[in-house]
A protein has these predicted regions:
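Short hydrophobic alpha-helical segments that form membrane-spanning helices or hydrophobic packing faces
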Residues: 186, 198-202, 362, 737-747, ...
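Flexible, disordered linker segments and immediate boundary regions flanking tandem C2H2 zinc-finger modules
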Residues: 125-127, 590-591, 758-759
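Hydrophobic residues within membrane-embedded alpha helices
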Residues: 8, 31, 685-688
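Bacterial N-terminal signal peptides
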Residues: 5-16
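Aromatic- and Gly/Pro-enriched helix-to-coil junctions and flexible linker segments
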Residues: 18-284, 348, 368-539, 547-574, ...
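An acidic, gly/pro-interrupted, aromatic-rich
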Residues: 84, 89, 161-165, 266-268, ...
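Charged, solvent-exposed helices and adjacent loops that form client-binding or oligomerization surfaces
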Residues: 204-214, 752-770
Length: 828
């Protein structure tokens, strides 16, 4: 079945490509007699290279300058004077050129004739010449770097390859971790949530009978849960620099959440990694058997659309150049672990990647149209379309915002504005046009029956393919020679060629990136998987496998993992399973003095690496302990069509992966705990321990509310203080308390001085107790949860606590103390 992507044009003026037909002599004479003199007389002073001025980003001294246009878009659409901005400007319709006085009527008439005949213009921009310093011999020599060699599978397995390195270094492996430590580690690593007491008890029992079998069964159970995709999908969202706003002016991306959901579903469905990458680079070009598959492929290309954009950039060429650079940089770092974008302004300083290789790749993205879905409003000089999805999900996207209006009302408003614009010039006309654009955007987002359409961010092929010109120093006004679309010459073994002049090359790029002959794709991904499970990558520079990057601490192990990954048809779950069941993963984190002297940083994995819980796991664990976690996926996103509040995380009880991510306003519960920078590709999180984190855990509203809810659940389920204390340790630490901890707890309660403020109201659903607060209050507080599956807390209770002043009861303070401790935050 042939599938066509339906495009919603939201008030965006595209550039039309002109046929290559040569103008006739008569047409050129008309230009030289009537148009060139007028441009020189009326326009060159403000819009030419010789004058040293390009006001509003517009140059009119070459044909390319007119076609590319300036801040407001292409100035010239050959064959169509009515849609050409230069025609509007010389008639003083919204724009006024020249500003001092209008051109004579006969000159204006000449421009109409000239544009409608195809705008013949012999003036060509003089190109500079760029000469690379990197030779073919340099590139050939560069292939000797370890990362550019084809990985070869060594003899052995994970444990034998690790033990071989330990023996070489004179190190002894630590003992295996106890069952309590191991089940907590496995749970957080695979699903990002703590195990319940019943799960712990079952695992400990099974582990004592057959440790290997218990681990295998636990791993398989967790990999089958939907929470796995939420945990591991978030790892990829770091790489994909996922956010729901553009950065810079922070224009919202109302439909970014669809890409987020695609990623989570892909991990849960165990989509092979090579297919996962192909979908994100060229999903719109892949065959699809059903509308659902086509829908999924389109949403996958949101990977190229969700990056940071400078919407206040007035020069459209600069905006496009920066967007292409961001797409190219993200793609090459994410999949290849190479900093190809460093060759944008000059030859790469470390790797044999010449600047023309950068622009060979850039041509692929210049031939791709990006749909990121921001409407033309004040301060957004670069609006965009969206892709209308073939499968409508009836999600009330909220993109309309504000008060509801009927379609008829909006049509009447547009007609009224059109009438007002007829007698208005200058600034007032532009303001009316912006107002019209906003209303038209709302109207275009509705079906005829008034229901919202389903849109997605993504990319598609442009109507006309282009090759990129090398830009000297990366400057858009310093173009040099054109280079054909292609791939980095380092990988000539992949035999990359663009299949036709009508192809951007994205489909071929996707195939090259995931080819089993590509030495980097499998290595880069397996290095990250190892890092997420073991705590340290084999290659420290996770997004730079080039000459400036680090060498692997165990190259044989990295190659083993890479080859196994490809042998298993790029099955991520299988590789997670293989690593977690290994004895290397299952080691204790206990300190060994002799080993520490030889390998203080545990580079060779003689023990498990103690790690801090990342921001999402920490917040989600507190929601679980409080019994407040809503494990259902929310519909859409809270951020749709509106700015994200700094405290958006406070009332939101869904998993943290569903929190709205505003590039300039990340929720505090994430930003304080080393959340990935959403402006760039992040392939690993920092681990910091700073005072602000401790203050948040001890004094923050979210932590206090969670502790109060946990204490209330303990009080309802257990009658004695001794039971409550013992169970609290099981819930928070995943193990029973030690005698010393019980003694310290006894002293805590004996010495506690009671202080009180207003008490929160807690309702436990299984007791039927009503909340004192009204539903209206909840709505005013911004709770958008709606009905959903609430995940029971460790004790089996499902709590619902409203935010407010927290009563500092002895038990709630005790619970908050446990949550604030290293025993909770550190994963041993």
């Amino acid at each position: 079945m042939t599938r066509t992507a339906f495009l919603l044009t939201i008030l965006f003026l595209p550039t039309r490509m002109v046929s290559a037909q040569q103008p006739s002599d008569a047409q050129l004479r008309f230009f030289e007699t009537n148009i060139r003199p007028a441009l020189v007389k009326y326009c060159y002073d403000c819009h030419s290279v010789d004058a040293g001025d390009s006001r509003a980003g517009l140059l009119v001294d070459t044909r390319q300058g007119l076609l590319q246009g300036g801040d407001s878009g292409p100035a010239l659409i050959p064959g169509n004077h009515a849609d050409s901005l230069i025609w509007e400007a010389i008639n003083w319709e919204g724009y006024e050129m020249p500003p001092s006085q209008k051109m004579p009527p006969e000159v204006i008439a000449h421009f109409k004739t000239w544009i409608d005949m195809g705008a013949p213009d012999p003036r060509e921009r003089e190109l500079l010449e760029f000469k690379t310093r990197i030779t073919s011999d340099d590139i050939a020599d560069g292939r000797s770097h370890w990362a550019f060699q084809t990985p070869e599978k060594p003899t052995g397995n994970i444990d034998s390859l690790v033990f071989e390195k330990l023996t070489e270094q004179g190190l002894q492996p630590a003992i295996q971790a106890d069952a309590y430590t191991l089940v907590r580690r496995i749970n957080f690593d695979i699903i990002g949530l703590p195990p319940t007491p019943s799960e712990i008890e079952a695992f400990v029992f099974a582990y004592e009978r057959d440790a290997d079998l218990a681990v295998r069964q636990k791993v398989d159970e967790l990999l089958a849960r939907p929470q796995y995709g939420e945990r591991w999908g978030r790892h990829w969202l770091d790489v994909a620099r996922y956010a729901e706003s553009s950065g810079s002016r922070n224009t919202p991306y109302p439909h970014a959440w669809r890409y987020r959901n695609y990623v989570i579903d892909s991990f849960n469905n165990n989509t092979p990694y090579d297919q996962f990458i192909k979908q994100q680079i060229a999903g719109d070009l892949l065959p699809a058997k059903t509308d659902e598959e086509w829908n999924r492929n389109l949403l996958a290309t949101g990977f190229l659309a969700i990056g940071m954009k400078h919407h206040d950039e007035k020069n459209p060429r600069k905006f496009m150049s920066d967007m292409v650079d961001e797409q190219l940089d993200t793609t090459t770092q994410a999949v290849l672990g190479l900093t190809v974008a460093c060759a944008r302004c000059h030859d790469h300083k470390y790797d044999p990647i010449p600047t023309d290789d950068y622009y060979r790749l850039a041509g692929i993205f210049y031939s791709t149209k990006t749909f990121y879905g921001t409407a033309r409003v004040a301060q957004n000089h670069r609006p965009s379309d969206l892709i209308l999805l073939p499968v409508q999900d009836a999600v009330a996207s909220g993109v309309i915002g504000g008060r509801n209006q009927s379609q008829e009302q909006m049509k009447n408003q547009i007609a009224d504005i059109d009438r007002q614009m007829q007698g208005v010039r200058g600034k007032d006309r532009r303001e009316l046009r912006n107002q019209r654009n906003r209303i038209a955007t709302k109207l275009a987002s509705l079906n005829p029956d008034g229901t919202p359409k389903s849109f997605g961010m993504g990319v598609q092929e442009k109507d006309e393919m282009v090759n990129a010109n090398i830009l000297i120093g990366g400057e858009v006004d310093k173009p040099a020679q054109e280079v054909p679309r292609g791939f980095v010459h380092l990988f000539d073994n992949l035999n990359f060629t663009v299949s036709s002049r009508q192809s951007s090359g994205r489909l071929e790029l996707a195939a090259a990136l995931t080819s089993k002959d590509n030495p980097l794709a499998a290595r880069v991904m397996m290095n990250r998987v190892w890092m997420h499970l073991i705590g340290k990558p084999l290659v420290k520079t996770t997004s730079n496998f080039g000459y400036a990057g680090a060498e692997p601490t165990n190259p044989e192990l990295l190659d083993y993992l890479a080859v196994r990954f490809m042998e298993e048809d790029w099955d991520i779950k299988q590789m997670i399973r293989e690593i977690v069941i290994s004895k290397t993963y299952r080691r204790s984190s206990q300190h060994m003095d002799a080993n520490h002297v030889l390998d203080p940083d545990n580079e060779y994995n003689w023990r498990a690496n103690p790690r801090t819980l990342d921001a999402e796991a920490l917040r989600d664990a507190m929601l679980v302990l409080s019994g407040r976690l809503n494990s259902e996926r929310p519909v859409g996103s809270n951020s749709i069509g509106r700015p994200v509040a700094k405290n958006a995380d406070q009332n939101n009880v869904h998993r943290s992966v569903y929190l709205p991510i505003d590039r300039d306003n990340v929720p505090e519960s994430l930003s304080l705990f080393d959340f990935a920078d959403p402006n760039i590709t992040s392939t690993g999180r920092l681990e910091s321990i700073v005072p602000a984190q401790a203050l948040y855990m001890m004094n923050g509203d979210f932590a206090g509310t969670s502790a109060a809810a946990m204490a209330a659940n303990l009080e309802r389920k257990y009658s004695s203080l001794t039971e409550r204390v013992q169970v609290a340790f099981h819930w928070v630490y995943g193990r029973p308390p030690t005698p010393a901890e019980l003694q310290a707890s006894d002293l805590f309660f004996r010495d506690f001085k009671f202080t009180s403020t207003a008490s929160p109201t807690i309702r436990t659903e299984n007791t039927g107790r009503p909340s004192d607060r009204s539903k209206g209050s909840r709505k005013r507080n911004g709770d958008r949860r709606g009905p959903g599956k609430r995940q029971a807390g460790p004790g089996g209770l499902v709590g619902d606590i409203e935010l407010g002043p927290v009563q500092h009861t002895p038990l709630s303070v005790f619970c908050q103390t446990l949550m604030s401790s290293a025993g909770f935050r550190i994963l041993n």
